[in-house]
Amino acid sequence: AYIMNKYRRSFVDDQLVIDSFESVEKYLTLLLERNLDSIEALRQWLKDKSELEAVLEEDMAWRYIRMSIDTANEEYQKAYTFFVTEIQPKLAPIDDALNKKFIACPFHTALEKEEAFAIHIRSVKSQLELYREENIEIQAFLSEKTQEFGTISGAQSIEHDGESITMQKAGLYLKEQDERLRKSVFEKMAARRSSDIADIDTLFDTLIQKRTELAKNAGFDNYRDYKFKEMGRFDYTKESCFEFHDSVEKHIVPLVKKIQQERLAKMNKEIFRPWDTAVNAEGKAPLKPFETGKEMLDGTIAVFEKINPEFSGFLKTMEEMKHFDLESK
C-alpha cells in the first residue's frame, strides 16, 4: 500500500498555532530583514516565503471549510471572522513590503529568464500595482461579508417524509420518474430559497457598493476590470470573454434548445417544467451506485487502487484525517 508522508517544513515551525498575528509576525520579520546578496539567497527566500504563505492559506482554508460544513457552529464562525478581520489586514501591508523587497532585489531579473519565475514575477508586479492601503479595511469587510451567502444557503433545508434534508440531498429527488414527487420537492426547495430573497438582495447590494469602492480606489472604473487584473488574467482580455459569450449565444444556445426539444418529445410533453430538467427523459430510474458517503468513498478507493495505488493512498490518508464531508453532498 502507498504511504503518503507529511511535508516537513524547513522555515515555519511544524507545531505553529496561528491564534494571533504575533504568532506569525516573527517569520514575516525574518523575511523582511534577510539579506538577499546572491541569487541562491533569493531562491531560498522565495522558498521560505512560499512555505509561510502556504501555512497561512491552509489555516484560513480550514477555518472556512469548518464554518461552511457546520454553519450553525458559532465557534467556527468566530474563528474564520477572526482571521479575516484581525490577521489578514495586518498581513496585507507586510505582504506588499515583501513584494517590493523582491522586485527591488537586482537578482530577480535573472530569475525572470526562467518561465516559472517569470509567471510569478508578473503576478507580483500586478499585486504591487493593485495595492492600496485604504482598501485593506474594505477587503477585510468583503471577506467577512462574502461568507454570509454560504451561511445563508448552508442553513437551507426542507422537510420530506418527516425528515429534514439538505438542498443537495433534495436535488436527488428531481431525478425520480414520479413527476408528483419531483414537483413537490422542487416547490419546497423554491419556497425555502424564496424565504431568503430579502437577505440575499441586501447582501448583494452591500457587496456591489463596497466592491465598486475597492475598484475605484485602485484606479478602475468598475469591479469587473479590477477583478480581472487581480485574478491574473494576463493571457486574454475582457473583450475575449465578450467574444466567447457571443459565440455561446450563436452556436451553443441553439444546440441546447434542440436537445431540450428532443427531451420534451421523449417525455411526451409540450413545455418544460423546472422539475423536469434532471430526470431521465427515457423513463429510466436514476442510477444509485452507492447509498452512503462511506460506500462512495470505499468504491472510489477500490477503483483508484487499480489505476494507481498512489491515488488510493491519498484518499485513505484524507479519510484518516477526516477531510471528507460526503453525506451532506
Predicted regions and their residues:
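A well-structured
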Residues: 2-289, 299
